[in-house]
Amino acid sequence: MTRLTVVFLAILVLLPLATSNSGADEAPASLSDLLHRTKRCAGGNQCTTDAECCGNYQCRCSLASNCSGSNPKKRCT
């Protein structure tokens, strides 16, 4: 086979693999990400949004003094 034929065949084989929509291009969550999310699922852990809290927990300021400033300290409650 000529080089051109080999390149053409390689493209035919690899093109469907590169364009498949199997979700393989999504990076798996790292162990540290999973642990970080798990820690926030318990009540009382720090958060920035309700999405970081599990179940019926909501991200709220525990004290009014914690809510002032540009970096409020919130917890899942």
UniProtKB/Swiss-Prot annotation:
Q: Which GO terms describe its molecular function?
A: toxin activity
Q: Does the keyword DNA repair apply?
A: no
Q: Could you state one GO cellular component term attached to this entry?
A: extracellular region
Q: What is its main location?
A: secreted
Pro-peptide region(s):
22-40
PTM summary from the entry reads: Contains 4 disulfide bonds.
Q: Which UniProt keywords apply?
A: Cleavage on pair of basic residues, Disulfide bond, Secreted, Signal, Toxin
Q: Please give the tissue specificity annotation from the record for this chain.
A: Expressed by the venom duct.
Tell me the disulfide pairings in this chain. Answer: none
Q: Give the signal sequence positions.
A: 1-21
**Compartments in which it is found:** Secreted
What's said on domains?
The cysteine framework is XV (C-C-CC-C-C-C-C).
Q: What name does this protein carry? A: Teretoxin Tan15.2
Q: Which organism is it from?
A: Terebra anilis
